[in-house]
Amino acid sequence: MASEEENDDNFQEEEEAQEDNAPAAELSNDSDAPLKPNNDEDDDYDPEDSRRKKKGKKRKTRKGEEKGRKKKKRKKNESEEDSDFVQHDEEVEYPSTSKRGRKRKEEKQAAKEKESASSGMPSVEDVCSAFSVCNVEIEYSEEELQSLTTYKAFMHHVRPILQKENPKIAAPKLVMLVAAKWREFCESNPHIQQEGGAAGSGGSAGQARSVTGDEPEEPRSSRSSRNEKPDDIYEEAVEEEEEEEEEEKKPRRKRSGRGKKGRRPSGKVPTLKIKLLGKRKRDSSDEEQDASGASERDSDLEFERMLQKSDDSADEKEAPVSSKADNSAPAAQDDGSGAPVVRKKAKTKIGNKFKKKNKLKKTKNFPEGEDGEHEHQDYCEVCQQGGEIILCDTCPRAYHLVCLEPELDEPPEGKWSCPHCEADGGAAEEEDDDEHQEFCRVCKDGGELLCCDSCPSAYHTFCLNPPLDTIPDGDWRCPRCSCPPLTGKAEKIITWRWAQRSNDDGPSTSKGSKNSNSRVREYFIKWHNMSYWHCEWVPEVQLDVHHPLMIRSFQRKYDMEEPPKFEESLDEADTRYKRIQRHKDKVGMKANDDAEVLEERFYKNGVKPEWLIVQRVINHRTARDGSTMYLVKWRELPYDKSTWEEEGDDIQGLRQAIDYYQDLRAVCTSETTQSRSKKSKKGRKSKLKVEDDEDRPVKHYTPPPEKPTTDLKKKYEDQPAFLEGTGMQLHPYQIEGINWLRYSWGQGIDTILADEMGLGKTIQTVTFLYSLYKEGHCRGPFLVAVPLSTLVNWEREFELWAPDFYCITYIGDKDSRAVIRENELSFEEGAIRGSKVSRLRTTQYKFNVLLTSYELISMDAACLGSIDWAVLVVDEAHRLKSNQSKFFRILNSYTIAYKLLLTGTPLQNNLEELFHLLNFLSRDKFNDLQAFQGEFADVSKEEQVKRLHEMLGPHMLRRLKTDVLKNMPSKSEFIVRVELSAMQKKFYKFILTKNYEALNSKSGGGSCSLINIMMDLKKCCNHPYLFPSAAEEATTAAGGLYEINSLTKAAGKLVLLSKMLKQLKAQNHRVLIFSQMTKMLDILEDFLEGEQYKYERIDGGITGTLRQEAIDRFNAPGAQQFVFLLSTRAGGLGINLATADTVIIYDSDWNPHNDIQAFSRAHRIGQANKVMIYRFVTRNSVEERVTQVAKRKMMLTHLVVRPGMGGKGANFTKQELDDILRFGTEDLFKEDDKEEAIHYDDKAVAELLDRTNRGIEEKESWANEYLSSFKVASYATKEEEEEEETEIIKQDAENSDPAYWVKLLRHHYEQHQEDVGRSLGKGKRVRKQVNYTDGGVVAADTTRDDSNWQDNGSEYNSEYSAGSDEDGGDDDFDDQNGAERKAKRRLERRDDRPLPPLLARVGGNIEVLGFNARQRKSFLNAIMRYGMPPQDAFNSQWLVRDLRGKSERNFKAYVSLFMRHLCEPGADNAETFADGVPREGLSRQHVLTRIGVMSLIRKKVQEFEHINGYYSMPELILKPCEPVRSALKQDVAALEAPPTGGNVDKSATTSNSVTPATSAAPSPAPASEKGEDKDKDSEKEKDKTSAEKSEVKQEQEAEEDKKPGDVKQENPVEEAAGDTKPSDAEVKTEVAKTEPKEETKDPEVKEEPKTEEKEKEKVDDKKPIPPTTVIDDDDDDVMIVKEDGELEKPSASSPKDQKAVAAATSAATGATGKGAEDSLEVLKRKFMFNIADGGFTELHTLWLNEEKAAVPGREYEIWHRRHDYWLLAGIVTHGYGRWQDIQNDIRFAIINEPFKMDVGKGNFLEIKNKFLARRFKLLEQALVIEEQLRRAAYLNLAQDPSHPAMSLNARFAEVECLAESHQHLSKESLAGNKPANAVLHKVLNQLEELLSDMKSDVSRLPATLARIPPVAQRLQMSERSILSRLAATAGNASNAAQLMAQFPAGFQGTTLPAFTSGPAGNFANFRPQFSVPGQLSNNSGV
């Protein structure tokens, strides 16, 4: 367009180009359609992109300074095309005056609209008819025609008129109507036509702005070049219109105008100034050509363009402009004036990367002065007058204060922008706010930069590759904008390389260009949804543009200076090469086909050869053009990486895979092979493919025979023929296994193949299934469930041994599995609906074998469970040992015809787990667990094994390596003991000291905390760098690895390992190193790196193909890998590493079975050398003890099949944990003693590695091998070897001292606390931590020093009597003093010796804590005879001859163990207890019952012993114990003076606690033998709970002992008992027992069913009267007993109880009184005895009758109450059922008196013993009922009055009352009293009615009684609750201390850890003080 300012073109380089600030508003899509012009002039305007397409302009530099301005970023275009291309405009700009304003823009808009008016847009009539709106004819006045020259003004005028006539018109329709009116108006308005002509003559609307000639020029200082495009103006107007319509809901753009005042200031740059970014790059040339269409029709313009082309051609010869970069329009287009255009250079700028942008707005027309200061106009912008004006800081304008709106009184402070700048933000853009970067994109530096015309990037010319010498002419596009698009979507970058840049390449921005200008990076790209065959090299810049995030991530991950190196070239010795060749043979390739090409193109660049091998074609589809695509599954890639390939693609093996697929499909879908499409894609085949077709061996799908071809009963003598093609050979035993499997399948017997690990169970299974398939017996489908880690190996074996199987591996993520379900399960369409897991709707299966993992069996059960499986194979079948597991339950729901289980460990020695395995295998045969366990109850081990073999024989086959591989190399295992390093010792001590409180807590620490401590100690034994504190301080070498010397010296194991590996490497051995901890493997990696050994590694994080690849690399012939690092758990399954012959177990697993599996990785088929196994164990550490205990526990699980014990073998109890933690700590804290330290020099290491060493001898039995595996190599240590004849099976934990940690760690802990306190600076003093709960011993005297403390532990029992000495000990004491001292030292040494091991084998016999079978039997017999052993068993007749050789400590430890076993839950038919001790037929119920009965008897005798004396007939003895009694009085009187209170060591109070406690247990079944008991049924129920009651009473009595008030009256007596000599011990013990026993019956004690009211009264009465003599005590007791006899009514029953009970109780009381009086008369001494049975037995009835007959003179001859007491006393003395011993004892002579008359009879003894037994059973029953009544009274039990039994009782009482109250009527009636007679008849009628009612009630009574809850339930005495409470820990520290006070002073040192509060503490309640009538007892050691 020509204009008056064309002459200023020569000054354009000096003028600053400005962009117009015209506002823009949004334009809705609805308004675009009618406004879009069809001519070429408006092609720049795209209605769809009206909001996005903005034209950016390049600004010229001025005064030689090439300054650029950054363009504003615009929004990304929604269209992908638009986002890739950008439009460029003519860059010609014109200077203009400052008065050029809005009018000029309006004229341009009018011109633009006029041009578009003739573009065929819809007219007003068209719009009205289309939208059904009413047209309004508008008359315009001349004034309106002159003023309405802009679309905006016209719209404001017309729109209200149109809207008034069409009130409901939609806004978009109204806009279109207004636009149509505007076009019509423009055609008729002459004013607009004139301006439009001027505009039209200028040429294109998008190139220059028209300026009318009559417009005045403004001064130069305010002149502004506003080059605005008419399409922008039109776009702005339409957007403003839409903005007004929508009431400014989307105010994205700011309108500008001088007359607008209400706009708020904005800090943002107006949108019109936003320049285009480099997103829409490539449509610029087209658009510019279109945009110039109108001007080309002008002849002047055509002439100018011709000149321009000639100039361009001349310039191209001179300027080296890259053709690739210059894709835009010519650099300069003419301005339509017809004058030649001056060529301009590409835009440059001076960049300053440190420049900060000014936040204030500045206008572009801001001229600068000479010194760079801005020049403002010197007159007011409003009034055009000078004077005092204020200057705008962002533009040249100036204003008077009064001319502003609103007026200002004073100039504003700070920077100020004028109203024009505030309103018109478009002109206020900061001058230097250029869109382009201020720094070079390559080097990030500033300076002179070359700016891209399509994006904000800027570059130095020398940073480009190749560099540019000159600035290119015209538009220049950077290498990023000019790079071509990618051929597809990149999926991943495989690798990169340096590539030489060709000379014709355009400039690049490669980062490597500075170092090497000739090199650029290229990346090897795997395309999305394309196979690896299509990978390509892509230049870096191309990838950087299209995938910036991908390349950034890759660059962060890899070194970008040196390309990564992949596998070495394939050679002939590489197994990978052989495998590839085998695959090639299968697909018919020549061995050398393109091998070099593939190696160079793919293998060296990180593409594995397997990824290029077609595994199979899984589906196909046909395109519309007839071509066929095939879905290809690639080898070793998941199914979701399958790709669609064309049939004609040059892919090796694809043609054969297609043939196989089509053959299989034809067979499965019953199609003929002719239906297969044979046409291939048109075009020339590659040479490779032609050769492939010619030379490949044709291999098609061969279906199996339709009918069986062989008999399954016929065995294979040799390998079957169908295996010959595989080239593999089966072992003879494997053929035998296959025969057995085939036979079992034919017979329908589900099987377990249980061959030992390494015998090839996988191969046998695969071959078995293959034989069924190939011989026509079964086509499948076969389901094989295996561990995930072994799945790849299984897949490989199927491929190798069963090549014709269609085996699919159902594994991977959900996408992979969806592909499998859709393509691999069936050929039928719609068999699976959608990608979700759903039911398979077909029975035509495509596959033969489906290989999957356990987890997917459960996850995808909806699909897999819908298939009818022919055979199920489960590898590692011990996963099915629990029927509660999800895998078991879901797999059990599958439809399976035959099951085969594979396991190397078929029996985990647990009947329940074995049953679950068999139940899964054969549900019909094994379905009753109880019956199954019952078959093995109470039978010997041999019988169990025999039955198991009979049961499992048809189902299981098990062969061992020793059975079938006699020529297999042997293995030797060595335990290598290693010393702790100095750093390890430091950390070991610190860990123990830090955890002192946990170790020394009252309960011995919780199991969880102890396990945590143990794990820390194990980590310390492995390496101290496993702790962060040590790792942080460790020295590191280059690369971040630990420095090798310090790393090795820090751990004793690594020192030895380093020496071993050097020699092993020199001898060409290969090593497996196992460790539990993956972090330890990390340290070993650093160690191996430092030693420069090559290695492989497998742990839990390496699975699937990565695992198998590592194994293959290690097993490859000639492999350089020397060491294989494995984690014990992850490396134990499905791994074959037979190329290694040395196994080092760095740290043993908790479960030794895992270690066995681990070293079986090397000792298996294929091993050619002897296998040496070295197990590192740190000496004197927790590790050594863990290994011992774990192995022994593992051995116990092999001793017998027993329930309730899992197969893990390493579940440690808390006591065992404590014992493990103690091991070796004492030596650790001693001063460094180098004498016993183990040092390995080179000679010792060589001897260790000598392969001629036998090591641990081979055993035929695995169990024996395990037993003997703990022998230590002789050279490994200087310490003594263990005795060979004693084989320790299990070391007990009972020999631990509760104060051990206090003695060992207290001083260290206190020192540590002080150090910590000092480190905290000033503050509160850290008080000494004192533990008051350590078994009472420590609490007794906390001021003792450590040495005294330790000495006390071993001196507690040094003064026991000689009766407990070993045989022959008496002779030593008969010698002189020297011999006596010698014997005493021997006794002390024997007592100080540690306890024997818990289990040991001596001479083939098992010993338990040193007790052989005979001694254990003797101990049990003593328990059954006397009940619980007393405290001083060594001084009583309890200690039988067989037990006298045991020390008291050993004896008490065995007692504690025995009682723990009694309270252990479990079935009596089990052969061992939980800790492995043989049960030996012990019946827990019978033993507990006997203990309880003996406790009841002992309690009853002790109750009346001090009244009745010790002799039944004192007249038979001259002096009946007068000296004894006097001595007792003296001792008691002497000890009464200093009474003590509080907690006392209550050795004598054990009787208190136990007497009532154990009195709970009634007799077992014999109690119900007594037929005379009228309440026989209830008695039976009581009998059932006998043992339970005894145990409850123990616990409750233990609680009683904890009450402080209970001890007040005990102390004098206890002290008396403590100081008594052995001669009078028993008498004193009797007194001591009686009084504390009565005192402990405190009414406040909860859960005390054993306490009678009379005993409570005794306590109350005795408190104010201290016992002065025994006689007084006896008198008191007699009185109290009589009173309590009367008080028995409320104690036996509540007020609601039966009256019969009350009556019987009162009768018993009367009898008691009478008996007492008789005894006093005859013997001159008191006698008292009673059993308050509540009338539930016939005892009191008998006593009444007998005492009536026992007239004076015949008291001894008639058996009555007195005889019963002495019978019980005799049983206490001589034991249960020892009738003859009792009769022969003179103390119980009264028992013989009633039988003197029968002496002459022949069966005299039989009569006598039968009577005694019957009588004793009656007494036993009475005692049991008495105890139960005590419980009922304590629990306040009352019968419900509405209960039928109670109503019957009430009626009986009514009858009784009625009869008794009317007895006189009978006499009066007989006397003839008629009124009395009448009354008598009424009474009799009442009695008859009552009796009739009672009769009917009695008939219902049996059913009612049957519903009564058992006695045990009503008395809250269930066995489980009793045992759980019995095993409960003590509630607090004081309770624990009081509990232990019942034991002898040193007993704490002999018990389990935490015995004070653990279950063992409560076992003491079984132990009453043992006393015998007539003897004095002594408690030694008190």
UniProtKB/Swiss-Prot annotation:
Primary location group: nucleus
Domain of life: Eukaryota
Localization per Swiss-Prot or TrEMBL: Nucleus; Chromosome
Keywords: ATP-binding, Chromosome, DNA-binding, Hydrolase, Metal-binding, Nucleotide-binding, Nucleus, Phosphoprotein, Repeat, Repressor, Transcription, Transcription regulation, Zinc, Zinc-finger
Residue ranges, compositional bias (Basic and acidic residues): 104-116, 218-232, 295-319, 1569-1611, 1621-1664, 1679-1689
Residue list for modification Phosphoserine: 79, 83, 201, 204, 210, 221, 284-285, 292, 295, 299, 310, 313, 1691, 1694
Chain ranges of zinc fingers (PHD-type): 377-424, 437-484
Pfam families recorded: CHDCT2 (PF08074), CHDII_SANT-like (PF06461), CHDNT (PF08073), Chromo (PF00385), DUF1087 (PF06465), Helicase_C (PF00271), PHD (PF00628), SNF2-rel_dom (PF00176)
Job of this protein: ATP-dependent chromatin-remodeling factor which acts in nucleosome-remodeling by catalyzing ATP-dependent nucleosome mobilization. Involved in regulating transcription. Plays a vital role in development. Binds to a portion of Hunchback (HB) protein that is critical for repression of bithorax complex (BXC) genes. May also function in polycomb group (PcG) repression of Hox genes. May also act as part of the nucleosome remodeling and deacetylase complex (the NuRD complex) which participates in the remodeling of chromatin by deacetylating histones.
The protein's name: Chromodomain-helicase-DNA-binding protein Mi-2 homolog
Organism the protein comes from: Drosophila melanogaster
Gene giving rise to this polypeptide: Mi-2
